[in-house]
Amino acid sequence: MSRSSKKSPFISYRLFNTIDKMNLKNLKQLVFTKSRSSTVFPSMVGHNISVYNGKNYVPFLILNQMISSKLGEFSRTRNFRGHKGINKKLIKKSSKKVTKNKKSIKKNIKTTSKKFKK
């Protein structure tokens, strides 16, 4: 469910104050925050913000395209390790079978070629 149109977008009070102070002093320092639910405002554009993802802080630069999105969208909380796929042991076993089959085929070819030469 979306936020009511009567309410303004949420931003952490502490985060808003630090960015406002940095804008007044023309500073561009890294800001650390745990507020993933804060909305990106136009005053934040150009600042480097590090958002906590539960394990460590993920830094990124705020761009114009990020306005009105949440800070949590830019720091992943889960790592994608890939789909299950084929087991590597099965691949090794199947490759061994193929090489054995190739060797047996070569032996058969040699024996049949000897038979035809006679």
From Swiss-Prot:
Assigned keywords, A-Z: Plastid, Ribonucleoprotein, Ribosomal protein, RNA-binding, rRNA-binding
The name this protein goes by in its record: Small ribosomal subunit protein uS19c
Cited SUPFAM superfamilies: Ribosomal protein S19 (SSF54570)
Family: Belongs to the universal ribosomal protein uS19 family.
Protein transport is among the record's keywords: no
GO biological process, one term: ribosomal small subunit assembly
NCBIfam families: rpsS_bact
The keyword rRNA-binding is assigned to this record: yes
A GO-annotated cellular component: plastid
Domain of life according to the entry: Eukaryota
Entry's localization field: Plastid
Pfam families on file: Ribosomal_S19
Annotated Gene3D superfamilies: 30s Ribosomal Protein S19, Chain A (3.30.860.10)
Primary site of residence: plastid
Function: Protein S19 forms a complex with S13 that binds strongly to the 16S ribosomal RNA.
Region (Disordered): 92-118
